Amino acid sequence: MTQFVGAIDQGTTSSRFIVFDRHGAILAVAQKEHRQIYPRPGWVEHDPLEILANTQEVIGAALARANLTAADLAAVGITNQRETSLLWDRETGRPLCNALVWMDTRTDELVQRYRRDGGQDRFRDRTGLPLATYFSALKLRWILDNVDGARAQAESGRALFGTIDSWLAWNLTGGPDGGVHLTDVTNASRTMLMDLATCRWDDDLLATFGIPRACLPRIVASSDLHGTIRTPPLDGARLAGILGDQQAALVGQACFAPGEAKNTYGTGSFLLMNTGTEPVRSKAGLLTTLAYRFGDEPPRYALEGAIAITGALVQWLRDNLGLFDSAPEIEALARSVPDNGDVYIVPAFSGLYAPYWDDSARGVIAGLTRFSNRGHIARAALEATAYQLCDVVAAMEADSGIRLATLKTDGGMVANELLMQFQADMLGAPVVRPRITETTALGAAYAAGLAVGYWSGTQELRDNWGVDATWRPTMPAELRAHHQRSWKKAIGKSLGWIDRPQAAADDVG
């Protein structure tokens, strides 16, 4: 009897497999981290074969812990780190190079060249996205231009392009022996190659970026029967859901009505608001993106505020500065001081994303005195997450005309109660943590389960959602205003830090 649904959650730092029951409760979970590869400053890579091996390992471990087999699963869904891009040989299954991670900035020179003719928003009307190092099109262009033989193989169709969802789906459904090469609308919308209105690859964009159509995956719905898994230990299970991680969290938080929003605190942070069946064009620095598409229903769209570095700042304090041994320890260190000591951190390690979109911004620690100590640095790091989200919320309210009444949250950092209270204080609005915080994986499970009738519809998914904790604002308005002014001053020190060389004369489009 197929009593459960499985979800592969392939993230920036680790791969997980989670088994959910009909109420969205977790039956079993297994997780394994993969290496972060930094060949040069600004370059970030992952080994696709390591990710694939880890994914298969955690699937087996989770099933074993629950004493289950593939036959016990009604369906399996995939959710993944978005934009991270790779090219692989369809005959051997070997990647042509490491995957270029979403936060990798090596395409900065290409971005500047394309901006010369039409500016940062040159393609925004069609794609919903500004020209930035974040998105997949120029990552693929870089691979085609810099990896030996890549362009010829891509043009012939021997090399296949994909984000991580495509890579996993292709391998799970057979790989070189008939694996399906596809991606869902949410992941496709992050490539800068898809027309938002049609949900199809756009020939003009392909020509402009120099991308051969032969290497691209087929674009499919987020919730549908995509294929049968043909590799152990899920051999025979149905692959029926694919969602980019932030869209998956939107689904997992049951944000199915226009105006409903969630924020995920992870390596970066991502605020998404459902805008319904029509895309809303941002005038305040947000992204217009796909929210999801269930079967033959019209696609749903979202506004997104993407923040590159939040949880990654905590990792940096741990790994590069050695302020603590494990990430959760930052809360105790931050609580060792009563306030931030007027220290502010702008973690622009990969430039600044929404609403600034400045690839030349760099990280800043401002306000240091001899009084400043480790506790102040830790507290400022947590507060930086809240300040960045407030910037995005202000932009989203300006675009949507909707005042955020309550913030639904998820992701690893929601366990940090000091951060959650400070977030409520800075927003001036309640912050809510749901009972089930693994909403990214849950969203992928929901998409898969809906496709096979395991759940009857979105109302049943709404009924699964419930509140675990709520934080309400208590900060005096004068202190909030002081923090806002100081944060804006620190942002000003970060913007435009890199002096750009004169762009090359050759025209790329």
Curated annotation (Swiss-Prot):
Q: Which GO terms describe its molecular function?
A: ATP binding; glycerol kinase activity
Recite the UniProt keywords alphabetically: ATP-binding, Glycerol metabolism, Kinase, Nucleotide-binding, Transferase
The annotated pathway is:
Polyol metabolism; glycerol degradation via glycerol kinase pathway; sn-glycerol 3-phosphate from glycerol: step 1/1
Q: SUPFAM superfamilies, from UniProt?
A: Actin-like ATPase domain (SSF53067)
Q: How is its activity regulated?
A: Inhibited by fructose 1,6-bisphosphate (FBP).
Q: Which residues bind glycerol?
A: 82-83, 134, 245-246
Report the transmembrane regions from the record: none
The parts of the chain that form a coiled coil are none
Which CDD domains does the record cross-reference, listed alphabetically? ASKHA_NBD_FGGY_GK (cd07769)
Is this entry keyworded Membrane? no
CC per GO annotation: cytosol
Q: Which residues bind sn-glycerol 3-phosphate?
A: 12, 82-83, 134, 245
**One BP term from GO:** glycerol-3-phosphate metabolic process
The protein's job, in short, is: Key enzyme in the regulation of glycerol uptake and metabolism. Catalyzes the phosphorylation of glycerol to yield sn-glycerol 3-phosphate.
This protein is called Glycerol kinase
